[in-house]
Amino acid sequence: MKILCLHGFRTSGSFLQKQISKWDPSIFAPFHLEFPDGIFPAGGKSDIEGIFPPPYFEWFQFNKDFTEYTNLEECISYLCEYITTKGPFDGLLGFSQGTTLSGLLMGYQMQGKLLKEHPPFKLFIAISGAKFKDPSIRDVAYKDKIKVRSVHFIGEKDWLKLPSEDLANAFEDPLIIRHPQGHTVPRLDEAAIEKLQKWTKEIIVAHSSENVLDDIQKIGNGDAVQKIPQDSHDNIANGHKDALGDSGEKEQTVDAVPT
């Protein structure tokens, strides 16, 4: 399964990759993660200058109230082409601006506004983010609950805490993992690791079951949908157990770097 990972404002794909790589490796062991850079060079000072080397990028620009956006259409067009040509992608992961943008793409896809030929996204990992405030965007992208399995990391000291909660509410049955940190890719304690491992395992099992069903239909007569025996489901789950791990047994130390 492939996940497209979108970085925060005026950072880079390699910076987000470094942060995510410090999480327990079993969490994303079954996935292939891609970390592209934003399409525009940073138009000002980056919060990670002196902490992580340039270049830095941004996906689009916005005003102080986050009600007006510049180059957003160009950004969306670029990402749709990227997803179409280098995908399919099973899900998105985002931090801050990357989270906000990912949520928009998923909402638009569900409403049939873009990525019509791309398979529906199956998962979303949101690390701080917000909804777009412009009514012309908001009233379309978040019109209905977004039916994608999602996990949302929300920091107690994050200046985007409330917007992150609002974005989580746009999804159907979101998993919310709270942490005491600020606007950052958080350190994960044992409880958070275990929750995330369980969440990813459920997605892998569901994805594997869908693939088995597809294979059965392809080799059948094309009309009848056959049920998968329970022992097949068990074998699927057990087959991924080693890769995913039973539980998180150590705390990860991710540098709390604001972006």
Positions of PLM-derived features:
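Gly/Ala-rich beta-loop-alpha elbow adjacent to hydrolase catalytic centers
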Residues: 93-103
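The conserved beta1-alpha1 loop
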Residues: 4-9, 128, 154-155
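Acidic catalytic loop of the alpha/beta-hydrolase fold
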Residues: 132-133, 154-162, 183-184
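Conserved loop-alpha-helix segment in the C-terminal half of the alpha/beta-hydrolase fold
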Residues: 156-174
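Catalytic histidine-centered segment of alpha/beta-hydrolase-like enzymes
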Residues: 182-194
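A conserved short beta-strand
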Residues: 115-130
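Serine-hydrolase catalytic machinery in alpha/beta-hydrolase-like enzymes
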Residues: 1-88
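Short beta-strand/loop motif that positions the catalytic acidic residue
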Residues: 146, 151-154
